[in-house]
């Protein structure tokens, strides 16, 4: 039986560019902080392990196993603290023909099991020169209901959130690195996708010289449940009540009136 109420946290952090070791330490520390607050699910920003500025040449120089220890420790933390974890990270996939990099989000449950690995589908501008695009939108069934994942620019198209909604998503997490000059779109996109699909959306952003912060959780009617500052690192926490979805959908019949 799924839990109708649960506590989530968005870890709005400053990411140290290209410093995997320090970023991982910060991620583990935030997980421990969240556990002390009895958080059920914690989400981190996009590319939280390495940042956004790494070049194609620098990617190629990374060792093949640079993620292995990090993911193993994430699984250990999830199991030890009994917490679900979503982290945006740099994924490396090597085949006989090539080595590809993805802008991904790993989702680990409170038993340390990897539930999903979502890859960013829509790549923003020069990201196309560094990363390979994903090809599906992920929704996973959990003890907290059905959880969807989108990464940053995926949110700027109406189809991804609608696809996840039609797959049954009740809350969508959006790990992001959202810039200052697009802050107005951040607020609009989160609210609009939430309202049009009548579900919760949790957007987790970073804070630094280019990211606007303002991590926020949006309710099924598009209203803001809670919002972080634009400059400070913080653990933004709130209780999600899934009953609000049915309440809002009873008042706003978008999905029942949707022409299939």
Where is each model-derived feature located?
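Short beta->alpha transition motifs characteristic of CBS
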Residues: 56, 106, 118-124, 216, ...
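Cys-nucleophile CN-hydrolase/nitrilase-fold catalytic domain and related Cys-dependent amidase chemistry
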Residues: 20-21, 28-109, 179-195
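Short, glycine-anchored, charge-dense loop/turn motifs used at functional sites
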Residues: 8, 107-115, 218-226
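Short polar catalytic/cofactor-binding loops
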Residues: 12-17
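Active-site catalytic loop in hydrolytic enzyme cores
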Residues: 96-167, 180-182, 188, 192, ...
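Extreme N-terminal starter segment of soluble prokaryotic enzymes
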Residues: 3-10
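CN hydrolase (nitrilase-like) catalytic-core segments centered on the catalytic cysteine
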Residues: 66-86, 155-234
């Amino acid at each position: 039986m799924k839990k109708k109420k649960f506590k989530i946290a968005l870890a709005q952090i400053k990411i140290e560019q290209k410093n995997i070791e320090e970023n991982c330490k910060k991620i583990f520390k935030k997980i421990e902080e969240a556990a002390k607050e009895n958080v059920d699910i914690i989400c981190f920003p996009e590319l939280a392990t390495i940042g956004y500025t790494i070049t194609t040449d620098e990617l190629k120089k990374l060792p093949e196993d640079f993620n292995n220890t990090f993911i193993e420790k994430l699984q250990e933390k999830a199991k030890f603290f009994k917490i679900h974890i979503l982290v945006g990270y740099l994924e490396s996939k090597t085949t006989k023909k090539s080595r590809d990099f993805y802008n991904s989000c790993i989702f680990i449950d409170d038993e340390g099991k990897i539930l999903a690995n979502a890859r960013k589908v829509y790549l923003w501008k020069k990201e196309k020169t560094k990363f390979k695009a994903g090809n599906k939108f992920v929704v996973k069934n959990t003890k907290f209901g059905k959880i969807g994942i989108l990464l940053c620019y995926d949110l700027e198209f109406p189809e991804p959130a609608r696809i996840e909604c039609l797959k049954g998503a009740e809350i969508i997490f959006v790990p992001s690195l959202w810039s200052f000059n697009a802050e107005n779109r951040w607020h609009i996109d989160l609210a609009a996708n939430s309202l049009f699909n009548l579900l919760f959306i949790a957007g987790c952003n970073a804070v630094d010289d280019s990211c606007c912060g303002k991590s926020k959780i949006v309710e099924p009617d598009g209203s803001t449940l809670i919002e972080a500052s634009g400059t400070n690192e913080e653990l933004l926490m709130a209780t999600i009540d899934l009953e609000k979805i049915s309440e809002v959908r009873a008042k706003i019949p978008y999905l029942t009136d949707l022409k299939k």
